[in-house]
Amino acid sequence: MKKTLNEVVKDRIMILDGAMGTMIQQYALTEEDFRGYRYRKTPGLMKGNNDMLNITRPDVVSDIHHKYLEAGADIITTNTFSSQRISQADYHLEEAAREMALAGARLARKAADEFATDERPRFVAGSVGPTNKTCSMSPDVSNPAAREIDYLTLYDVYLEQIEALVEGGADIILIETVFDTLNAKAAIDATMEAERRTGKTLPIMLSITVSDLAGRTLSGQTLEAVLASVSSYPLFSIGLNCSFGAPQMKPFLKELARKSPYYISAYPNAGLPNSMGEYDETAESMAPQMQEYVDEGLVNIIGGCCGTTEKFIAEYAKIVEGKQPHTPQPKSQTMWLSGLELLDVTPDIRFVNVGERCNVAGSRKFLRLINEKNYDEAVSIARKQVADGALVIDINMDDGLLDAREEMRTFLNIIASEPDIAKVPVMIDSSKWDVITAGLQCVQGKAIVNSISLKEGEEVFLSHARDVMRYGAAVVVMCFDEKGQATTYERRIEIAERAYRLLTEKVGMNPLDIIFDPNVLAIATGMSEHDNYALDFIRATEWIRKNLPGAHISGGVSNLSFSFRGNNYIREAMHAVFLYHAIGKGMDFGIVNPATKVAYGDIPTDQLEILEDVVLNRRADASERLVDLAEKIKLQQEALKNGAAQGATTATAAEPEWRKADVAERLSTALVKGVADYMDADLQEALAAYPKAVDIIEGPLMAGMNKVGELFGCGKMFLPQVVKTARTMKKAVAILQPYIEADKKEGTTTAGKVLMATVKGDVHDIGKNIVDVVMSCNNYEVIDLGVMVPAEQIVKKAVAENVDMIGLSGLITPSLEEMVNVATEMEHAGLDLPIMVGGATTSEMHVALKIAPVYSGIVVWVKDAAQNPLVAQRLMNADDRKKFKAELDDRYARLREEYAAHQQKLSSLDEARKNKLNLFE
């Protein structure tokens, strides 16, 4: 029985053939030889287009194959280095590219079969060159975002070529002379697709060419980085060809052999070209140089590139006789990531700091810069993060008013030209899968995808996982499934284990490429059910590291302290304490600000105790104590700003002072402070002063809620304080409820019926819950559908309950698209119910540009909870409602015009550079 490729390569060092072009030159072919009769009228010169000889002079190509086989080649390469549309476009022969590849493979197959025996099989490697274009570099020095070709175009071109090679009889696909790893990824991707289509196993040989003595590719990667970039793929071999002679290639070959889990190939040039562009090495002089490769156990396959002929191959065949082949290294037991350089996530790194500032959802400055197309300054943010110690850069372009796919591509392309940034891997962060794939198609290194989850079920999860593997990336897996986000220890480990089994058993993903995010959630919110969030994350981290071998742990650390936005010291101190404990249990990735100024060891002991009480949930009053500490620090900072002595800042405003105001002011202040101690007495006094109980709600209590909204909006109140306010409001409502009911019995009817929901994809509900309280206090009947509510459920319930209006809430960027979807579904259902939109990521501009155009009814953006009853009141009045709609239509039209005008004013990067001020003319 004929030996297989895998059997032969384990048994001995295999011989690859030599140069095709060098051999063709020996035949002194003319322009007419290249053209043949068929292409006699094709415009342009054809001489030098060696691949067309497969069609016009197949005898020459066959003769060369025979010579190499006679010299002892085990593997001959097809004459198809440029047999694809991109290269053939230079000769106006795009339509002949597939035929060239097919003919080339058939010629090689026929020759190999003539020499093959069961004991000495001969193999055909389908040659796939890099093309004359690159996916990773700009053709225009003044426009780093530009690309002459994109990944998918290259993929399609390669797929056509590779399918033809397989049809023609190729045993192996040789992706050679790789100078851009992104080009190589496209070729590997196409090869794996050809395998799926044909049902054939296609061993992939990958051969890199380094461009200088520093050992980097033309696109800037080190060989270690290249190895990491392709480490997810099932390669047969990796090696080097072209560029250098054997001595110059040797140190780089040793580097590959030292780290690669694949077989190693080497086919150097016949030395370095002389001043005439010719090669001076002979077969006899080069054989001893290649002997060093063999004797040192560096290679499994050797052959020749530029300048080599069948004589070189005959010499190489002699020197490998009886020699042991290289033994590939075991697969790395650590995660490999790469930009231009390798990031080997070894235990001594301990923690991979993922820079968080290149995120439009998390940085207002970065969002503004991207909106303004100020990429130079946006790039400087990435540069600073790397300088501050970020080992990976997170990039997120998810904003309702941005073309996220285009901005992701643009920014990744630009930073690819900045070596001080591009040296580190990127984390492509988006809630939109098309944005993630667009980003992956721009990255030659091994990136991290952030993220996938089981939220949409196993089928989508597995599909996304296969895409991750297709592009050679690692992946963040959120602990989120069809039931929702995991918030307890038990749910976190349940989802993590399920996802791990699916990824490793059904998709075949390397466990080292899996990074679990067990959900860093806000603590110290004032809600007891949130108190264990950090501790449960830490416990889940420990369990995952012990029970799911190879997997890593990450988290968006800033989420932890969301309650204290505006107080940077408290936030950074919370992060430091959390990371100290989480890293100790195995958390090894984190999306953080690398420039954070607070270290765990620098936190004063008294503060540390309070912070750890919160993070580890060690006492029931931990949140209150942290709020007090935050207030104290805030006062200290304000005193320092005002020039006061640092030690004289512990005084707080005396509570009795606000008690001296009138009852309306006292009620408002009580809400702002979240103090319910005096509520009974104050409300009794107010009931005597106001005609109806509801007037108290709409008057002083709503004034207090308005103030809360203002303070929270500008970061001067923290989430736990807002929750405390909401509870105080609920207490006030409970006290007033009997009086409200009595007023209703006297003829007052419900103000209206409101359906409220946090839209699909969003699990956050605190804002919605506050609106619920406020609306209920204003005599509205509220039907709360909860979180993660699909559009169809909202529509169905609205019809069934005959509601007067709908309130949509969302805290995260994906909610914006889902709100558009809800409005679209309502339009399709023929509804014209008013929609109130609110939440942290929402804006009036988004409503004007995205939601209002798809819905004929009223859509109104509500800035904060306190405004909802005022808006609802206008919506419930038939006459005012018409007037309100006309006002909104006019305002939205103006906003759209302003936005369009602003977009027109923004020059393109090219235009801006052309219009730059020249001080020297």
State where each predicted segment sits.
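Domain-level signal for soluble alpha/beta catalytic cores
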Residues: 1-921
